[in-house]
Amino acid sequence: MELLFTATLLHFIRLFEKAHEENVKKADLEKKKAANETEMKHVVHNSWLNNLNIRASTLIDQRRAFNTMIMLQKVEMPLPDMMAAVLGMDESVLDVDQIENLIRFCPTKEEMKLLKNYTGDKATLGKCEQYFLELMKVPGVESKLRVFSFKIHFGTQIKELNKGLNTVNSACEEIRTSQKLKEIMKIILCLGNILNQGTARGSAVGFKLDSLLNLSEKCSANTNMTLMHYLCKVLASKASDLLDFHKDLENLESASKIHLKSLAEEMVAITKGLQKLNQELTASESDGPISEVFRKLLKDFISVAETQVATVSSLYSSVGGNTDALVHYFGEDPNDYPFEQVTATLLSFVRLFTTAAHQENVKQAELEKKKAAKEAEMEKTKKRVSLTNKKASGVGEEESCLI
């Protein structure tokens, strides 16, 4: 038995040593591979720099030229084809990331001046210089690239802005028209006046919106029940149809995540972007044939974009009026109590109310369960007593018969 155990132990030790050796070999191979890749990059970089010097392509800063080369490798197409895609604003050829990279690597004024003043054979220049020269063939190429980028982003920007504006408008409408919320507010005011009876606050005609959050406080020092739980208990017994008032406020949570300042910034960005498109359209009229396709496509796009921007601008204007009306609805001043604070307070109230209502529901269910169990026990006791009485009555009859 001991020999078998020793043999098994030795077997597992050998397996462990073998696995460890394989892991060490694998780790060494990965280190060598990483080192080789790093060395290869240095070799390629140095080789490229040497080649750069041989070909006299030292007009552009070496680091910038190298980074430009890396960027162009990701585009993977001849420079004339790339520029045709830019002027044709062809999203099937160039994606937004590639466009942003092209913008980053547009030649500066100094670099363009350097290339224009170069009197040598331009064919001997490096790929970075060739790329810059290709871009320089198109007047205002950086502006055109930015137009292309705006066009790609425009659809998503308009969609998201529309969504945000509609959410805010819907939330304002839902809150102001919810009869259930209005009834709950009345009941809260009534309960507050009852609890504060005999004090200066016992005849209030309204309350601040922030007071809704005070309902999570205890009714008194002698009880663990909060005002919110008491409210839910009253509603459950007197107006249970109001307990699901939060269903009226479908867009409240989404609206609470939206900041009007962000919507304003998006609106400004889109409006300014459209202005730049019109400026570029005017500027490109003097470009000549090279920008003919670009001008036609841009003109068509502006026509569609202007209609969409006009629609969203109208929607944006309505949001300002609706949010102010909502704040006034609760007797607050938009300058002191902004829309974001209204939705945040209401959402907190809804969550506190929902939690309290659930807890009261569970508590009530437990009480009813205990009540039912108690009634069942009483019924059993009643039956036992009845049966005992019957038996006792039967014994008495037999005894009387014997007598």
From Swiss-Prot:
Cross-referenced PROSITE patterns: FH2
Pfam families named among the record's database cross-references: FH2
SUPFAM superfamilies reported in the protein's UniProt record: Formin homology 2 domain (FH2 domain)
Region Disordered: start-end pairs: 373-403
Domain FH2 intervals: 1-380
UniProt xrefs under SMART domains: FH2 (SM00498)
Top-level taxon: Eukaryota
Family membership: Belongs to the formin-like family. Class-II subfamily.
Name of the molecule in the record: Formin-like protein 21b
Organism field: Arabidopsis thaliana (Mouse-ear cress)
